[in-house]
Design a protein with these regions (language model features):
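Catalytic Walker B motif of ABC-type/P-loop ATPase nucleotide-binding domains
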Residues: 37-40
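Conserved catalytic motifs of ABC-family nucleotide-binding domains
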Residues: 33
């Protein structure tokens, strides 16, 4: 019940919202008792509020359960808000590896190879 969907145990997953489906995926991964949790763009198709809910669950898994959590994100504000360490790749090459508190807009511009836009932040178009 780490992701608060126990009451949905007997409901078809196809009837779930996108956020609930992500939580089911997280719960399924947790049932395997992993040492590392990999989440590839877990909030890509979610609204901003649900995105933060899912990211909070992933953060709790890391901080409360001690499971290393690696998350691939394209929303800069979520990376800064929920991450501890940021690894930036561009054209398959490492261009940033450091503490998220030390990352600057210039670092993000180097990662993306362009100026940062409002669409790089969740909830903005």
């Amino acid at each position: 019940d780490q992701v608060e969907i126990l009451e949905k145990a007997y409901v078809r997953a196809s009837n779930f919202s996108g956020g609930q489906q992500q939580r089911v995926g997280i719960a399924r991964a947790l049932s395997q008792k992993p040492k590392v949790m990999l989440a590839d763009e877990p909030v890509a198709s979610l609204d901003p509020i649900t995105s933060r809910v899912v990211m909070n669950y992933l953060k709790k898994i890391n901080t409360e359960l001690g499971i290393t959590t690696i998350v691939n994100l394209h929303f800069l504000d979520l990376a800064k808000e929920f991450g501890d360490r940021l690894i930036g790749l561009r054209d398959g090459k490492l261009v940033f590896d450091g503490n998220v508190d030390g990352v600057s807009d210039e670092d993000f511009e180097n990662i993306y190879g362009r100026s940062i836009k409002s669409s790089d932040l969740i909830g903005n178009d």
